[in-house]
Amino acid sequence: MKIKMVLFDLDGTLLPMDQDAFTKGYFKLLAAKVAHRGYEAKALVDGVWAGTAAMVANDGSCTNEEAFWKRFSAIFGERVYADKPIFDEFYRVDFQQARAFCGYNPDAAWAVARIREHGCRVALATNPLFPFFATESRIRWAGLEPEDFELFTTYENSRHCKPNPDYYRDVIAALGVRAEDCLMVGNDADEDMIAETLGMQVFLLTDCLINKKDRDINVWPHGGFAELVKYVCGPLRYR
């Protein structure tokens, strides 16, 4: 089946990372930024996780941004809305230091370029738990530019999260494509490969594999970036 649109995950796919190490480092930076506003570090982290859970559970009745801040304010009170500009500044400025907790693989940008040259459209289907500025930054850390993608999902422009299939339905609706014309590329055997249930083709990138349920990955096309390019473009475009 011809592939017309390739959807890429970001964290652990285009941007190599150990998610636990990244999250620990990122939370430490955030806690330092807002400590002067009275947010104790552990309570802050617990609050962010609660807000994240609210986004993952979002039924589409609001944006993920609204779901996060509603839950966060239920924990810390309405004062969080007055503090929101400080959090926004964190993601624009201080968050850049979190690059130190990520890896880099030049093959990521190479693969995106080859696939675009092959004539495929590309979009970034990253789990929309982060604000726009934090997502733009992580794209650049991967050696790419936001303009390389027709769409990238953020907590501002999304109403569902992975692994909810409605997240993928929203993405293909925004792009005006059919599921069967899409290939979802990601490193998570649950959150990314679930796109297959909508009729999408899938490719499991194994460089930073997440397989919490120990699934048999041989049921999906899988491998590194070289194998991905060969899968999409054919042997003639393989390196």
Positions of predicted regions on the chain:
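Hydrophobic alpha-helical core bundles mediating ligand binding, dimerization, or RNAP-core interactions
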Residues: 23-31, 48-52, 69, 90-95, ...
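A metal-dependent, Asp-based hydrolase signature
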Residues: 46-92
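Short, solvent-exposed loop/turn segments at secondary-structure boundaries
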Residues: 18-21, 59, 217
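Short amphipathic alpha-helical segments at helix boundaries and their inter-helical linkers
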Residues: 52-66, 95-103, 157-167, 194-201
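Active-site neighborhood of HAD-like aspartate-dependent phosphohydrolases
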Residues: 1-47
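Asp-based, Mg2+/Mn2+-dependent phosphohydrolase catalytic module
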Residues: 1-6, 109, 113, 129-130, ...
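Short, acidic loop-to-helix structural element flanking the phosphoryl-transfer center
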Residues: 63-66, 83-85, 92-123
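A cross-family glycoside hydrolase active-site/sugar-binding cleft signature
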Residues: 125-127
